[in-house]
């Protein structure tokens, strides 16, 4: 599979999560399941490479070739 064609967005966040999206080329996108969110082993098997802790959290129906990921931000110590 062509890992060079996978595009990784910059990371962005809110108060709770860090987010990123990953755009897959058409040949890989056709392998994305339409019935469920992928486990880490499933998206890694497609060639997506990112650190541990990312969760495929949403399917964007109009653009199924874009995978939406998030992971919890580290808890800030209370002052």
UniProtKB/Swiss-Prot annotation:
Per the UniProt record, one Pfam family is CKS
Enumerate the UniProt keywords alphabetically: Acetylation, Cell cycle, Cell division
InterPro entries, from UniProt? Cyclin-dep_kinase_reg-sub (IPR000789), Cyclin-dep_kinase_reg-sub_sf (IPR036858)
* Positions of modified residues (N-acetylserine): 2
Any GO molecular function = cyclin-dependent protein serine/threonine kinase activator activity
GO BP annotations, alphabetical order: cell division; regulation of mitotic cell cycle
Q: What GO cellular component is one of the record's annotations? A: cyclin-dependent protein kinase holoenzyme complex
Q: Which SUPFAM superfamilies match?
A: Cell cycle regulatory proteins (SSF55637)
Family statement: Belongs to the CKS family.
PANTHER family referenced in this protein's UniProt entry, alphabetically: CYCLIN-DEPENDENT KINASES REGULATORY SUBUNIT/60S RIBOSOME SUBUNIT BIOGENESIS PROTEIN NIP7
Q: How does it assemble?
A: Forms a homohexamer that can probably bind six kinase subunits.
Purpose: Binds to the catalytic subunit of the cyclin dependent kinases and is essential for their biological function.
Q: What's the name of the protein?
A: Cyclin-dependent kinases regulatory subunit 1
Its source organism is: Homo sapiens
Instruction: Please state the gene responsible for encoding this protein.
Output: CKS1B
């Amino acid at each position: 599979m062509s890992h060079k064609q996978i595009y990784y967005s910059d990371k962005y966040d809110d108060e709770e999560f860090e987010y990123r999206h990953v755009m897959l080329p058409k040949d890989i996108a056709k392998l994305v399941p339409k019935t469920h969110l992928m486990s880490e082993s499933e998206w890694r098997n497609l060639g997506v490479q990112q650190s541990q802790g990312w969760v495929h959290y949403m399917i964007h129906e109009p653009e199924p070739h874009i995978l939406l990921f998030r992971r919890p931000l580290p808890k800030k110590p209370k002052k």
